[in-house]
Amino acid sequence: MDKKFLRKFGIKIQSLSNNKHLFEFDFNQKLLDQFNSEIDISKSKGVCNVILLKSEMMLDVTFNITGETNLTCDRTLKNYIHKLNFSKKILFKFGDEDEEISDEMIVINRAKSILNISKYIYEFFILEIPVKRLHPSIKNEDNIDN
């Protein structure tokens, strides 16, 4: 894992005022490769627009991700571009210790100065990849289940 590369996905939360903040992060296959994914994807790229609402008690973070990746059809073995456009939200509550309460709520140490979102971009992107991969040319045929 290239920690120097991943630093560019850090948000300096200590210095932010209690307000709304906008960030934009471009990413590509290199980010996804940092996490040793077992999922067969290639040539991925995208943009993650982050809306961060900071208060005394928490960070309300919305991830708006648009991107694409190259997939292989399960039936025809043809490669195709799969486009993604989705939003996810996480609440980061300030506490004494880091603890993941649920997928949507995480406690982070209130002394933490930088929130690195690379892992979340990776996880959200990977979870949006369909399990059943069908090339668009056969996706709408009557004999194919969607």
Model features per residue range: what roles?
Residues 1-146:
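Acidic and generally charged, gly/proline-rich low-complexity regions
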